[in-house]
Amino acid sequence: LFTGCTNERLEDELDFRKIGINSMQSGDYEGAVAAFNSALSQCVGKITDTELDICYYKAAAQYAGGDIEGALATYQAMIDYDEENGNAYYLHGCLSLKQQDTDTAKKDFANAVKYNPDDYELYVGIYENLAGNNMTEEGEEYLNKAFDIKGNSAENLTWRGRIYYLLGQYDNAVKELEGAVKKDSAKANLYLAQVYEAEEDSANAEKYYQAYVDSGTADSVAMNALAEIQMEKGNYEAALEDIRQGLAMDNVTNQQELLSNQIIAYEYSGDFSSAWDVVQQYVSLYPDDEAAQREYIFLK
């Protein structure tokens, strides 16, 4: 898999890399893998970050195309090349877990934090993967290990606050996150909103969701959460505006939830014509949603 790349062939390598990325974006994962292999075949000599980057893309394309074994092999090749590549261990562990190979996953996760001991995101990612596979206690062990990371920067406080939130220790979460907000962490507003939402304090949840939106860094998930709070209060026009902002974002990760709430908000505001327009779009995108099919029949 690895040999390296000379300067003379770097341009061809980067061209094939670009072709692979474009193929991934269009859903042609087989073509993407072929392009990434062509990029790597240009390599002779010393390995650089470019080759490693291409391998990450290749593994992602293999996974997206349903070739989990191929993706595992690619990550393993990266580990064989650099036995201290914590990120490759983590990703190999995630896929091993999907294959129900929990023993390998646990070893991979242990190596991931061994070589990247100061990466909060890594600990949280491991927790989420383990908890999603009915191993919450094992996941919480990683969350608690993350407290060994020292520091009182805005980033440290934000991550610690989020971890306390995941552990259900809301008082500690608020303390850390309020400290992060004072140090101008926009993300801390989002996590504070989630803490207050978990405590069913909708007033404070709305306050911090709005602060997150006002920071200019909000994502579509935050816009949907803010819309749901507005809907609970009967402010359907405000909810619709939040939903429109969420759908207009560059990276919309929760389109289905946003469209579903948009239909409901239009209905409750009495705008059945707009609700009908959205439900037609929704049913075409998510034909297996039985509730949406019933809504389609109702509005029709």
For every predicted segment, state its role.
Residues 4-60, 64, 73, 80:
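N-terminal leader/linker segments that initiate helical-solenoid repeat arrays
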Residues 42, 46, 81, 115, ...:
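Structural marker of alpha-solenoid helical repeat scaffolds
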